[in-house]
Amino acid sequence: LKNCKKKILCGFLAGAVLFASGCGNKDTQDQAKVQRYAWPLGSSSPEDTVTQIYAEKFAEEVERLSGGTMLISVYPNSVLGGDRELLESCKEGDIPFVVQNTAPQVTFMPDVAVFDMPAVFETIDEVREHVDNPDFLSMMQQVYGDAGYVLLGYADQGFRVMTTNRNVQSISDFKGQKIRTMENSYHMAYWKALGASPTPMTFSEVYIGLQQGTIDAQENPYEVIVSNKLYEQQDYVVETNHLPHLISLIVSDEFFEGLTGEQQEIIREAAETAKEYAREQSDERIASRIQTIEESGTQIISLNDEMHEQIRELCKPVYESIEKNVSEDLVDAYLGDMKGVIE
């Protein structure tokens, strides 16, 4: 894996030199109309995911809009490193493009925890409307910029939902359930607020953990639940819709600033098209995943309005914790007209 990564990065660096030299005069520009090496885009996600669809569409659009003079190669499955390594390599300019879930970015950019405000939105369209709000997006671009990245946009995989063997009909049904979560203090605080027992665990251990009863439940987007067949070990999917599963597309600030204005515009336009396409694909895939789960006999439970209100009330300490660590202006811009929901 290390040798593979080294070859890819060496190729990228060699190509970057050639590409830069091709900007010197007309003769060399004509000779270097097409990059010798494609720019790498790294992702830790598997291939059959919305993350990969987002990345591939972006690369395709960059090539199309540039008339084939700008090329990007997508490397999924952590070929270029895990989430942390990808962020570090992107900041240093070694891997110019990264597509990933926002959760791992909180360590590098604490303000990204604004997306960990639980149980705020009722539909994914509401989330998208708020995420795309120009004022909020401008603030987030500043957050990423201060950390050494250029934020090109957010796609998503819908909401995160819970799978369990317990028929959840009231708040008390969450009590005592050992639920696997990511090692994120805000995510864990949410489940503790509901009375559950959050248990961080490596994702590769989740299926066998459910099978052996080490954990009672887990939470993920529908796509992850189906692609990893987690529903096979669970009787119910509970549509807690507690958090949107956002996917960011970022580029190294150092790399981006080295491009011409025309190239930057091509990248921004390609990112916008890819974002909309990925969202459409996500909606279609979620509908298909729900059908797969229902046909398996696993029951899907939707929470009523009363339960959503109770959950928001229980989550007040979580909101307060996030508000202490995230810019107040950023929280206000993200929540917008939904701020009253959590007060």
Predicted regions mapped to residue ranges:
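N-terminal lobe/hinge region of extracytoplasmic solute-binding protein
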Residues: 1-4, 160-161
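Short beta-strand-centered segments that line the small-molecule binding cleft or hinge
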Residues: 129
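Sec-dependent N-terminal signal peptides of Gram-positive bacterial secreted proteins and lipoproteins
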Residues: 3-26
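Short, flexible, basic/aromatic active-site loop/helix in glycosyltransferases
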Residues: 141
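N-terminal secretory/targeting leader peptides
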Residues: 23-126, 135, 144-343
